[in-house]
Amino acid sequence: MAETYYKPCSEFDRCNELIEKYWNTKQFEKCFEGHMELAEKGYPLAECQVGYFFYDGIGVEKDADKAFYWTQRAAEHGDRDGQFNLAYFYEEGIGTPVNMEKAKHWYKKAAEQNHDLAIQKCQDLNLGMNTAQG
């Protein structure tokens, strides 16, 4: 799983350093472009970030459909933040119709990876997840 998640570290690390530089200097468009480059190569962490950029309009125009698309990719590729965010999108109807069954599914998936907010959400929704199952 870690290999799929991070892929070749040297490429990821190089891109991540550049992305961090752009973020710290508030060059958000370049930061978005760097994340998109990694997301298109299948890095779940970058996919999640691209979804967030589209959701919040950071370095790119807000687009709920694209936010949903990239967040869903991240979730399906095992990113726990992506899973939590996708659950939230289903719960709130962001880029997709409201679907509480799918929201619950993704909250559980994120909670199984010890995502604190997902664990709390599962408790709030009485999903029978009193503790993380990592």
Feature locations, PLM:
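Long, contiguous interaction/recruitment modules in multidomain scaffold/adaptor proteins
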Residues: 1-10
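Short helix-capping/linker turns of helical repeat alpha-solenoids
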Residues: 10-11, 40-44, 56-58, 63, ...
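Hydrophobic face of amphipathic alpha-helices that form TPR/SEL1-like repeat modules
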Residues: 16-21, 49-56, 85-92, 121-129
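Alpha-helical segment of the N-proximal tetratricopeptide repeat
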Residues: 10-41, 56
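Leucine-rich solenoid repeat scaffolds
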Residues: 104-126
